[in-house]
Amino acid sequence: MHYPKVYDVIVIGGGHAGTEAALAAARMGRQTLLLTHNIETLGQMSCNPAIGGIGKSHLVREIDALGGAMALAADKGGIQFRILNSRKGAAVRATRAQADRVRYKAAIREILENQANLDIFQQAADDLIVEGDTVKGVVTQMGIRFDAKTVVLTTGTFLGGVIHVGLEKSSGGRAGDPPSIALAQRLRELKLPVGRLKTGTPPRIDARSVDFSVMTPQPGDFPSPVMSFMGDVSMHPEQVNCYITHTNEKTHDIIRGGLDRSPMYTGVIEGVGPRYCPSIEDKIHRFSDKDSHQVFLEPEGLDTHELYPNGISTSLPFDVQFELVRSIRGMENAHILRPGYAIEYDYFNPQALKFTLETKAINGLYFAGQINGTTGYEEAGAQGLLAGLNAARRAWEQEEWTPKRDQAYMGVLVDDLITLGTKEPYRMFTSRAEYRLMLREDNADQRLTTIGRELGLVDDVRWAAYCEKMEAVERETSRLQHLWAAPNNPMGKKFVEMTGADLSKECSAIDLLKRPNINFGQIAELTGSEVSQQVGEQIEIAVKYEGYINRQHEDVAQLKRLEETKIPADFDYDVVSGLSREITQKLKTVRPETLAQASRIPGVTPAAVQLVMITIRKNNMTKKTA
């Protein structure tokens, strides 16, 4: 059957990348189709039931600032909230939400089903319709043809997915779901640069069989933080504890004894696993000097006894899993509800993508999520939103948009993937961003919501809330600049009495806030401020970090000069005099779009960038005189 409706955007896959891609395109007014193999698994958390964390929550806030769904779903489904790095600087603080899987998934589905311009269809995609070098649509498993101006692929771990438990293996996209074999084969036929990666998940445990009395409880923070700029604590369901226990030497001996049947250590698995989320087999091998590792027992939801034992991801045979779980303190009688497993899947070298996440080889075809070599819900969601918005803009022949490294962690993510490529699952960290003081979790809305509004991603309700917040920040900052404390006036005396600090000369309330040991709460009490905590936090960070932020702005200004120098798509690196063969090959492989991107390619020296710049200028001069 040839479906009669022609779509602007078709999104294949209903995971974290796919849902954000479909929602972004539909919010922008494009006729959008979301194809999923199972409507019941839309927004499914395939592994850890948590959103956020170091570096990751910055991405979640950026998705939220652009009108995305992930943060709001985390607020509606979160059963424990914590601020990580709370004693460190604002740049590296991160919010983490332990989520109820069912509530999170329900929140995502509700948003999808109520989004205008979005159709959902349950059917696996088996083929892409490609005419010449342009994608024209999709053919489903039943042979239904859907035509579209653009297609976004967000296939997660489903492309050629193989599940491993010990030396036994089976085809699967995740436990209980079939893989995408036909689509994987079709993509290989298109000569896209394919590789294999691996990820894994731990066995799930029945909480009724666990002795929590010998474990350390880990409560959430109070007052509870929120994930979304539009969120509120009233959205949160009941809050619960997680628990901490540890592996021991007996556990490690059991694991070592099973390595001869490990698919990772017998060469059965060829794909590379995530460096920053290693299996328990990897941990005892790589950190052999450690006699124990932490295990976090995390509830999967409020209406289930299922626990996620974070820290013991494994693909060992089930009998070894059984023994290793029962060797851990408090889990001596543990019942395993689901075995742990590893999954191996196809991914495509992200260096074959444009910065818009469109493939260089096929016009109108976009990739997002694990297909690009990343790991994590947050990284997937960020790519999905960018791919969705750019597919939407291409469909209407509008200029596409991707944030720069100084604008967003999304920009860092995309630039890293396309400039550097990846041979292992890529995870975001704050350390990957040069301008992290400017790219904080708390100011994602200030960086991106205005842009999102211009792109058509931000609705009237979110825009009004953002404008109201920024007006409150401006009003309160101005008020504090005009309130003065002096050694002999009432406000000055109250300040000294409250804080025990010295006050030798007249200062504005803003100047008092600049002091390292003074926080906004104290200034609010001193001056009778009634603004929200969010507004107060913005003012405090802006005041305390003003000097550092100004210096980063100067660094960005220097970088922009390189960013503004575009390298023509057909630029011939072979004619650049003085370039080494090695650097020439690297530049030809990556095909950087700007001098700034060229400068970030490993092994490309500043002198080489200078040579490229000189050649570009010579070429431009030649064209002008021709």
Curated annotation (Swiss-Prot):
FAD binds at residues 13-18. One of its GO terms (biological process) is tRNA methylation. One of its GO terms (molecular function) is flavin adenine dinucleotide binding. The keyword tRNA processing applies. It comes from the Bacteria. GO terms for cellular component: cytosol. It is found in: Cytoplasm. NAD(+) binds at residues 273-287. Keywords: Cytoplasm, FAD, Flavoprotein, NAD, tRNA processing. Its cofactor is FAD. Homodimer. Heterotetramer of two MnmE and two MnmG subunits. Belongs to the MnmG family. NAD-binding protein involved in the addition of a carboxymethylaminomethyl (cmnm) group at the wobble position (U34) of certain tRNAs, forming tRNA-cmnm(5)s(2)U34. NCBIfam families: mnmG_gidA. This is tRNA uridine 5-carboxymethylaminomethyl modification enzyme MnmG. It comes from Acinetobacter baumannii (strain SDF).
